[in-house]
């Protein structure tokens, strides 16, 4: 449904992902689509994560990677960050981009709520260099309210930290 539909593209400081301990001071091409599997009242990006009528530009994985490579040459870009909305709801596009970017020596950063089955996560992890996982709260009741599962997120935090660089965010 949202394969290649980019609502946002920007060259951002890596610290904006936010990642404090991964290539500090560098820039990364940040891309995002629309949609999310959670429904948080406090969402910073609700306009793109929860709205049905969002403007977007259709891009292929090759176009995204070529843009990232051009920005690497021109502005020191280190890779691609999948962010703004919940990128894992567009898993196939993220997987295709990450695999291609990895083959070209670009870094892949995933900014996620961590709600994905371990099988798909394990397939993607070889191509992910760093993650910021948003731990929304630490109660099961809160996760039930927003449509998630705290235990799944905690399990994925542990799983991911065994394979790649992981930093956590708790917004509220």
Where are these regions (language model features)?
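Conserved Radical SAM active-site core
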Residues: 2-131
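Short, basic/glycine-rich phosphate-binding loops at helix/coil junctions
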Residues: 42-48, 136-137, 165-166
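Alpha-helix N-cap and loop-to-helix initiation/capping positions
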Residues: 56-59, 144-152
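Short beta-strands and strand-loop turn motifs
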Residues: 78-83, 134-135, 166-171
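Short, well-ordered secondary-structure micro-motifs
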Residues: 120-122, 143-146
